[in-house]
Design a protein with these regions (language model features):
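N-terminal glutamine amidotransferase
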Residues: 2-126
């Protein structure tokens, strides 16, 4: 004799929600390391990814000693298009981010990359 639980018809009809691994186009991220003019190349990379987010953009660079950050509302081409802005981002390492808002308000503090520069070291993430 075997025991088999009764099948619930509602459960049979209910579809399971399974994680869909399909790539979603939200935000754009670009990074580069050990390269001269890293912030300029990062701005170009973000420009190529502009379709991934238009709300805001930011770049964090690292010069081997300190992190430097510039974040702006709007398009990459309107914000990181001159030497005056890019000269504020020295270093051979940089990451950039185009914001496509999925959560949080439209504030500059929600524009990435985020970074922490401490006496013990630092980190930048996007």
């Amino acid at each position: 004799m075997s025991f088999q639980p009764k099948k619930n018809k509602k459960m049979q009809k209910k579809k399971l929600r399974i994680y869909n691994p399909k790539i979603k186009e939200e935000c754009g991220v670009f990074g580069i390391s050990n390269t001269k003019d890293a912030s300029t190349l990062t701005a170009l990379g973000l420009h190529a990814l502009q379709h991934r987010g238009q709300e805001g953009c930011g770049i964090v660079s690292f010069d081997g000693m300190k992190y430097h950050s510039e974040k702006r509302f709007g398009l990459v081409g309107d914000n990181f298009n001159n030497e005056e802005v890019l000269s504020k981002l020295p270093g051979n390492y940089a990451i950039g981010h185009n914001r496509y808002s999925t959560t949080g308000g439209t504030t500059l503090r929600n524009v990435q990359p985020f970074y922490a520069d401490t006496n013990a070291g630092g980190i930048a993430v996007s």
